[in-house]
Amino acid sequence: MTTTKPVKQIMHERKSVRKYNANTTISRETIMQLLEDATSSPSSSNMQPWRFIVIDDKEIQKNINIFSFNQEQIETASAIIAVIGDTEMYLNAEEIYSKNVELGYMPEEIASKLAQDSLAMYGAIPKEALLNIIHFDAGLISMQIMLLAKEMGYDTVPMGGFDKSKFAEYMELPSNEVPILLLAIGEAAGPAYGSSRLPIERLVRFNK
């Protein structure tokens, strides 16, 4: 279903879809490829704090809707992608930078220093600041997921309105993983509403 549309066209065609064809399935292979492509997203120090739980079991979708304010799309979408943030993402610094050396992206001495700096810096950051970084990075990759999904012919809607504590408890998340948002993905059952934007002149200033 992948298209060859220009990125700009995909951006403008993407809408938040809340009504899905409940009979449409998306293969796990397709979703894995989608998420792998999305991980090209930038992140702070390339620490890649995102984790994903793909929920494609209808019974589980129904269960999580109990603490997601009974949103129709939770149950009718082909899958729900839960975007999770890992507050211990910096513990992967050595693995990440060693891979950069292996791939020829940087010399070993620079990679070693960057890994040590990341471990020291992120290990000392207050939790609130760390959560801000993780939420920012999660927003970047979530946008990539939605655009890539649209390119593949699927629609999405991001949802921040759910009880994150109850979700974490239900999914038995470890203490270092925090739920950030839910992304519904599937085939639209009808056209989405359009949405206006404020004039760009009101949103932009130059130099001050």
Kindly label every feature range from the protein language model.
Residues 1-208:
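Acidic, surface-exposed loops and disordered segments
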